[in-house]
A protein has these predicted regions:
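Short alpha-helical donor nucleotide-sugar binding micro-motif in glycosyltransferases
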Residues: 96, 267-268, 275-280, 371
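A conserved mid-protein helix/loop that constitutes part of the nucleotide-sugar donor-binding site
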Residues: 205, 209-228, 244-250, 332
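Nucleotide-activated donor-binding/catalytic signature segment of Leloir-type glycosyltransferases, i.e.
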Residues: 250-268
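A short, well-ordered alpha-helix in the C-terminal region of glycosyltransferases
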Residues: 258-261, 340, 347-361, 373
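Short alpha-helical segment that forms part of, or immediately flanks, the ligand-binding pocket
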Residues: 274, 293, 297-301, 315-316
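Aromatic "clamp/platform" in nucleotide-sugar-dependent glycosyltransferases that forms part
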Residues: 288
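Short hydrophobic beta-strand element within catalytic cores of glycosyltransferases
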Residues: 305-308
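Conserved acidic donor-binding segment of nucleotide-sugar-dependent glycosyltransferases
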Residues: 320, 324-331, 340-345
Length: 392
């Protein structure tokens, strides 16, 4: 069975393999287990892949239908123009006509086009909305349009969203995502079990941020909180990731004399990210808007104490004593939460242990099983598994 996919994640063909952003590829490898072929509508980039990219597990079963080239990578891409719409229409139509089913990954401009066009050609539809389903202040109109289309009767397939929200149509399905396989989950479980109950009682708290350095991620708020805590509380911060705000963040670190506390590591391979989870005590992600909060669920699996925004699905993830939430733009509230964690290592050791136990459900293998069940139910098909007599 052949699956069409519409995604904003750019792709590169390098050394005989298709490459893309690692978290996206790890999830799509799960879809590859369910379908014989993938026909992917995506931007086609040039040159060697960045360090944070990986190849698909099996590039021989992938066809990429590009709709634009050389427009930047990932979230750094330039916005689509009206002149690109014909190319988008052509690429989506070509993929929809050759596929047996279609998966739209929203939000994104290509997802908007696909959500309008693909139902004309396909009966087997499934969408993923990776943003904040209930909306966020200041979000683009195109994001609101995609949400409205996917909620409507025009979209005749399931839509997976993060969180269980009231008053939703029956085809809106609360779901999850993961990039940790069973082996990595076991590694996380071992790291959580090996943590010292006394934690950071005799040293500085080790704080971690993992993600893109963009304005919406509010890393500047984290740095401002550290500056407010000086000199009474010293917290070490490792920042893993890159983005347009890095230069401004580095200037702030220098101006506030935080150089001994804050380290920038840029983009690193995912296995190195796991090492940071093992070494840290706590993680903060106080974005202005967040879909799933991937870094939070990964850090929870490793037993870290997590601080997230009080928006979207994050309060559910960190509820029942599994973490703390603060307003996304409130450095004083974040500083207070960090002060509480730094001063109560034994109490918050238990917070991390509760988080680790709860998050073990979110593995890549668990994601595959959940997708099989979802598609089997909504498409009224036998369980999808192309490696056992192939999906028909």
């Amino acid at each position: 069975m052949k699956l069409g996919v519409a995604t904003i994640c750019p792709h590169i063909f390098h050394e005989g393999q298709w490459w893309s952003y690692e978290p996206y590829v790890l999830e799509m490898n799960v879809w590859q287990e369910l379908f014989e072929e993938l026909v992917i509508v995506a931007p086609h980039d040039q040159g060697p892949p960045p360090e944070s990219w990986v190849p698909y597990r099996d590039s021989s079963s992938i066809t990429v239908v590009p709709f634009r080239r050389d427009r930047g990578r990932g979230l750094l891409q330039e916005p689509a123009s009206f002149g690109e719409i014909p190319r988008m229409l052509y690429a989506v139509t070509k993929a929809a006509l050759t596929a047996d089913a279609f998966h739209v990954r929203a939000p994104g401009n290509i997802a908007l086009v696909a959500s309008l066009l693909v139902p004309l050609f396909q009966k087997r539809l499934v969408a993923k909305f990776a943003g904040q389903w209930i909306g966020a202040p200041g979000e683009a109109r195109t994001v609101r349009w995609q949400r409205a289309i996917l909620k409507s009767r025009w979209w005749r397939g399931p839509v997976t969203v993060y969180g269980d929200w009231p008053n939703q149509p029956p085809h809106i399905v609360p779901f999850f995502t993961s990039v940790l396989d069973n082996h990595q989950m076991a590694r996380a479980q071992a790291a959580a079990a090996n943590r010292n109950a006394a934690g950071w009682a005799d040293r500085n708290l080790r704080l971690l941020y993992v993600g893109r350095l963009s304005a919406s991620k509010n890393v500047a708020v984290v740095l401002e909180a550290l500056a407010q805590l000086k000199p009474a509380v010293t917290i070490e911060l490792d920042i893993v990731g890159d983005g347009p705000e890095r230069a401004a963040l580095e200037r702030f670190v220098n101006e506030q004399d935080l150089r001994r506390q804050v380290r920038f590591h840029g983009n690193v391979a995912f296995d190195r990210v796991l090492e940071f989870y093992e070494q840290a005590d706590a993680l903060t992600l106080v974005s202005a808007s967040e879909g799933w909060g991937k870094a939070i669920t990964e850090a929870m699996a490793f037993g870290l104490v997590c601080i997230g925004s009080n928006l979207g699905v994050i309060p559910w993830l960190l509820g029942e004593g599994r973490g703390l939430v603060v307003p996304p733009n409130d450095a004083t509230a974040l500083a207070s939460a960090l002060r509480e964690i730094a001063g109560s290592p034994i109490e918050h050791f238990q917070t991390g242990q509760r988080a680790a136990a709860w998050s073990q459900r979110f593995s890549l293998e668990g994601l595959g099983n959940a997708l099989r069940e979802l598609l089997g139910k909504h498409w009224r098909m036998p369980e999808l598994n192309p490696h056992s007599d192939k999906a028909k």
